[in-house]
Amino acid sequence: LRACVGKGFMDFFNEVDADVFCIQESKLQEGQIDLDLPGYHQYWNYAEKKGYSGTAMFTKEEPISVSYGLGIEEHDHEGRVITAEFPEYYIVTCYTPNSKDGLARLDYRMTWEDAFLAYLKKLEEKKPVIFCGDLNVAHKEIDLKNPKTNRKNAGFTDEERGKFTDLLNAGFIDTWRYFYPDTEGIYSWWSYRFKAREKNAGWRIDYFCVSESLKDELESAKIHTEVFGSDHCPVELVIKK
């Protein structure tokens, strides 16, 4: 995030004027940055390990309550989840663990996925859920430029894709795909290597998902491919209420 702030972050932040603005992989510790965001409440979840992971949420309306993590010790050392409760719904920001080179963390990733879905369903017992973040998976072949060469790579394994399918089958909507079911060539992440962004050799791994009960409230979804400053670009959801 510190690098982004020097690359137009505040211009974008002010331009979109979001009611809720979420960040994943902030790579910050407490006190390392002081963002001046008039009119916003700021919530940060830091990883115990320095310069790693982390999430943040900035909200215009003060939430009823805010919680950090999943409430499961083995999953809550890396600052990956923030949940804010509002009158009509919960908003959750999530930075899903990367399965890493050689799929070194794939087994851990699978346990995380099950715990995260169970967490969302528990919230949903009380009110609908909107969750967003870097979910570190391209769901279908149209969600990345080079599916054939990435079948066994982190972010496109059958196991990871299957967990995202489970999430949709559990009653959540991938909002961008809801509006654009067949659109190809729109991505949210590009490697810094191989001139990937220049060639648009990207992956769509950043999502807004919502409970099925919010389907009629969906107004628009957007992936801001024109915004630079990171290897990811921002994604946006507009709802009616």
Question: Which residues make up each language-model segment?
Answer:
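Active-site metal-binding loops of divalent metal-dependent hydrolases
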Residues: L1, S26, L135, C233
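Short, acidic/polar
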Residues: R2-E15
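Metal-dependent phosphoesterases centered on the DNase I-like endonuclease/exonuclease/phosphatase
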Residues: D17-V20, H41, A115-A201, I205
